[in-house]
């Protein structure tokens, strides 16, 4: 959900973005030195792909992984697998939330929310059809009992509640669990809807042959459906449940579900209940439109909601303030025509034929805090992607004897998290519920996945890490203790030269990275998990017996405080090696293209590799997180990357290909390659020197890279440029102008291509410059854009495109853009035709420029701008009728007419005329460029 906004947008915070009736208090001065971040578990072996946490009364933590693994980490940092559930794991499904029963001290009951396997087919559900029964599944809330040793008692399982699920199609199936002071269970559920064919607006596709997963009216806006909701129930001793009084719909109300406490949510991935007040705090992810469209609806924004009583929060009809500017239009996906705005104030009308609930919905409530979109973000929130995680409210207990409990000054603060932006913000809540001061919390990590306060008043944080659907070395569980200037415990860091192999297995252990906050000398103690130990800082150990060993390093400071770290060693089985032969890491791709893949797996213990157990998954990368879209099993195969119809054309999106294999001994290895889009915003650089992002309304994504001086640079990785023949950059200059250069390896590496940037007449006046590329290495590395020129400011860079030459342009039904009969006369018809590899289908595409075949240009007849004006072949003349711009949604737009290249009548027959038409984002306007 990333959209970068100009600084002016943030200035609208108090006036437009917060629902506040009183002036906010001053932010509390949180001294980082008063808090200690303790690493409890880290890495895939200890947290897997981390999903959710719940703290037990003894301050140990239960945490889930999507693959069905439930782990427990005690206060000393010892982690064990306590249970494993069989789960359905297509797209985002798997094991999600975990909750601890308020009576755990006596009943030892916990709750898990997950996707049971059922008999769902493998692979993707079709986008169109008539029978969806095979893909109808559930996400399930079940209750379990933990044994005395904290292992999961599978025989105790009681299924409490099923939530419908449309399987084989992404997204929004998460669920979070919490309890109020009365023991009522709250469960948040996503809308279970696909956002990738709605142009970043509301997914309300009512075409009768469409997969129901494209219509969120059947779920979030359906009063008779449990998706897109916050549910509130009271679970009975036997596992059945009752509905407490005061939910949104009274029991017995026709066409409603009494379990619904609040409705109208898109992806309420994290929520918590403040037990002192019963108020629910919730983060709801929003869609990704980069700009408001009067015919569709508002630009994408996200919300933190403060739910004080039952209500409707509007999705998929209303968002943010629910004013007209932030309300969606009715939209006919079949015809691409707009309708009236939904009535958020009076209550939207759900007319979808898939709606089984009330037609007239309750009035929509505004967000407590909404950010991004046209309103910008609170200045304290900074910039980046939008991924709100609803954390806990801290309640100070003066009578609690705990040396690590948080201070009274944070009493009543809501701890908001941001996965993509990577922050934790304590927010003061006024007596009237208004938003007060927003403070910064001193955490060091990657992506906030979940948070919870423990019984001792410490804060626990689950860090997703930097992987895509697999966890990585940065995935972790942390505890934050408040020490108020006291001596802080040391941090232990443990690593091993190898973590798996056959006996005898010699492992070199290292304590490198261990430290003491006060700088004291540390002593070390290693427990090798087999009854032996060592006091050396970096010992070596040989294991002779097969098994899995949990190795613990304890670091001790001069005052006797300790920190621990763990490493898992598997003897008797070696983790498989998974190599992706293709696609190459860093190679370029186009949305809509079919990408062949090849995987080689080797494993010392598996005599032969079962290719049916090898899986390649396509993940749509999006800033620092991703959406798992589809997968294929096999050592070879192909995956078609769908045209992205959700994110703004200037969004930081890319493709991740994840190959995985689990060997016969249960060890899994993932290998990932990142594929890059041909067109990229300059401000999405990985590293840079000397430059600044600058907000500009004329820029494609609202920002450029500016303040460029001689010798400055920006860098992107990974990139493989061996097939790149030229580049085009969108630039402006009110300064000296200069030269833009492409290099690899380093900012001073060999220049592969360059383009002269002229003075354009102003910093807001953009033009395209093009350079030829040659000599690129046939390897993956870092791409550098370096800047050269005279003294002072040179130019700004908005975006750049890497061009790979000529090839077919593939459109509707997999057919090609074709010059009729291969003719070269001016006026020759441009048509859709079965792809045949002839010169009549070999197009050279210049970004924001001409599209050429047979030595002539794709032309709008007569320079016309009206709907239905035919496309033809014509002598290249540099006119606006021959200028074409590729959009991220797959459309090819003619800027002069502001219309898109379109297959007339949406008819895939050979010979169908190509013309221009209003840009609708429909299938007959989507093209895969070479």
Model feature map: region roles:
Residues 487-491, 575-578:
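Proline-centered linker/hinge motifs at extracellular inter-domain junctions
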Residues 517-524, 608-616:
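Solvent-exposed loop segments of extracellular immunoglobulin-like
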Residues 510-518, 598-606, 732, 820-822, ...:
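Acidic, Ser/Thr
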Residues 125-128, 132-149, 153-178:
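Asp-box/WD-like beta-propeller blade repeats and closely related beta-sheet repeat scaffolds
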Residues 30, 93-95, 103-105, 117-118, ...:
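Beta-propeller domain segments
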Residues 805-824, 839-865, 882-908, 926-930:
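Extracellular glycan-recognition/adhesion modules and their associated mucin-like linkers
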Residues 502-507, 538, 552-554, 559, ...:
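Extracytoplasmic
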Residues 1-27:
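Secretory targeting and sorting signals
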């Amino acid at each position: 959900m990333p959209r970068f906004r100009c600084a002016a947008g943030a200035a609208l915070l108090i006036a437009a973005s917060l629902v506040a009736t009183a002036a906010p208090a001053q932010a509390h001065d949180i001294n980082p030195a008063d808090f200690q971040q303790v690493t409890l578990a880290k890495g895939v072996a200890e947290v897997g792909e981390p999903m959710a946490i719940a703290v037990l009364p003894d301050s140990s933590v239960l945490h889930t992984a999507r693959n069905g693994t439930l782990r427990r980490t005690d206060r000393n940092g010892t982690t064990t697998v306590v249970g494993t559930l069989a789960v359905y794991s297509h797209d985002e499904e798997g094991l999600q939330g975990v909750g601890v029963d308020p009576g755990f001290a006596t009943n030892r009951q916990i709750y898990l929310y997950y996707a049971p396997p059922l008999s769902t087919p493998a692979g993707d559900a079709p986008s169109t059809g008539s029978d969806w029964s095979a893909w109808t599944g559930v996400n399930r809330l079940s209750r379990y009992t933990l044994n005395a040793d904290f292992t999961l008692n599978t025989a105790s399982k009681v299924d409490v509640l099923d939530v419908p699920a449309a399987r084989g199609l992404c997204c929004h199936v998460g669920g979070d669990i919490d309890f109020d002071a009365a023991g009522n269970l709250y469960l948040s559920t996503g809308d279970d809807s696909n956002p990738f064919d709605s142009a970043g607006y509301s997914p309300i596709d009512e075409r009768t042959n469409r997969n129901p997963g494209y219509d969120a009216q059947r779920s979030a806006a359906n009063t008779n459906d449990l998706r897109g909701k916050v549910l509130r129930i009271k679970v009975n001793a036997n596992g059945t449940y009752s509905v407490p009084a005061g939910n949104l719909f009274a029991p017995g109300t026709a066409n409603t579900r009494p379990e619904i406490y609040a409705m109208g949510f898109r992806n309420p991935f994290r929520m918590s209940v403040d037990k002192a007040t019963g108020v629910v705090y919730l983060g709801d992810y929003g869609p990704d439109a980069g700009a408001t469209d009067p015919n569709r609806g508002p630009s994408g924004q996200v919300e933190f909601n403060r739910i004080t009583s039952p209500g409707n929060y509007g999705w998929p009809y209303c968002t943010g303030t629910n004013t007209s500017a932030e309300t969606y239009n009715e939209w006919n996906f079949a015809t691409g025509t707009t309708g009236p705005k939904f009535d958020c104030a009076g209550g939207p009308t759900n007319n979808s034929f898939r709606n089984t609930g009330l037609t007239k919905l309750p009035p929509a409530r505004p967000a407590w805090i909404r950010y991004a979109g046209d309103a910008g973000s609170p200045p304290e929130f900074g910039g980046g992607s939008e991924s709100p995680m609803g954390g806990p409210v801290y309640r100070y207990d003066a009578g609690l004897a705990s040396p690590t409990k948080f201070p009274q000054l944070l009493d009543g603060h809501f701890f908001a998290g941001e996965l993509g932006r990577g922050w934790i913000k304590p927010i003061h809540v006024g007596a009237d519920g208004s938003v007060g001061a927003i403070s910064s919390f001193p955490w060091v990590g990657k992506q906030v996945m979940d948070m919870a306060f423990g019984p001792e008043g410490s804060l626990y944080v689950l860090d997703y890490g930097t992987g895509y659907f697999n966890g990585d070395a940065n995935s972790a569980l942390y505890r934050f203790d408040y020490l108020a200037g006291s001596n802080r415990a040391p941090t232990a860091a443990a690593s091993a030269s190898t973590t798996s192999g056959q006996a005898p297995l010699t492992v070199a252990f290292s304590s490198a990275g261990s430290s003491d906050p006060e700088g004291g000398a540390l002593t070390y103690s290693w427990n090798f998990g087999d009854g032996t130990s060592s006091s050396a800082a970096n010992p070596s150990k040989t294991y002779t017996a097969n098994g899995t060993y949990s190795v613990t390093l304890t670091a001790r400071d001069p005052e006797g405080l300790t920190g621990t770290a763990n490493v898992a060693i598997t003897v008797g089985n070696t983790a498989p090696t998974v190599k992706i032969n293709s696609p190459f890491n860093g190679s370029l791709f186009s949305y809509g293209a079919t990408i062949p893949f090849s995987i080689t797996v080797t494993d010392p213990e598996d005599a032969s590799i079962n290719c049916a157990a090898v899986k390649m998954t396509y993940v749509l990368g999006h800033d620092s997180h991703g959406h798992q879209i589809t997968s294929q099993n096999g050592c070879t195969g192909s995956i078609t990357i769908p045209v992205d119809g959700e994110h703004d054309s200037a969004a930081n999106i890319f493709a991740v290909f994840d190959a995985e294999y689990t060997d016969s001994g249960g060890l899994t290895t993932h290998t990932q390659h990142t594929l890059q889009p041909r067109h990229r915003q300059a401000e999405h650089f990985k590293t840079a020197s000397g430059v600044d992002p600058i907000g500009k309304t004329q820029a494609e994504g609202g920002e450029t890279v500016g303040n460029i001086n001689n010798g400055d640079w920006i860098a992107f990785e990974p990139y493989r440029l061996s097939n790149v023949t030229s580049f085009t950059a969108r630039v402006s200059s009110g300064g000296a102008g200069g030269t833009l250069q492409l290099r690899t390896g380093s900012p001073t590496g060999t220049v592969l291509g360059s383009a002269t940037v002229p003075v354009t007449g102003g910093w807001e006046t953009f033009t395209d410059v093009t350079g030829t590329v040659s000599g690129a290495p046939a390897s993956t590395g870092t791409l550098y854009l370096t800047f050269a020129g005279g003294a002072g400011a040179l130019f700004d860079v908005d975006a750049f495109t890497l061009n790979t030459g000529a090839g077919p342009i593939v459109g509707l039904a997999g057919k090609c853009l074709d010059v009729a009969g291969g003719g070269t006369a001016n006026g020759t018809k441009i048509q859709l035709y079965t792809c045949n590899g002839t010169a009549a289908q070999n197009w050279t595409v210049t970004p924001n420029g001409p599209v050429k075949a047979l030595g002539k240009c794709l032309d709008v007849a007569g320079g016309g701008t009206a709907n239905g004006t035919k496309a033809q072949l014509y002598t290249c003349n540099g006119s606006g009728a021959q200028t074409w711009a590729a959009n991220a949604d797959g459309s090819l737009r003619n800027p002069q007419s502001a219309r898109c290249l379109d297959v007339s009548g949406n008819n895939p027959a050979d010979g169908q005329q190509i013309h221009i038409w209003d840009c609708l984002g429909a299938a007959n306007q989507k093209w895969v460029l070479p």
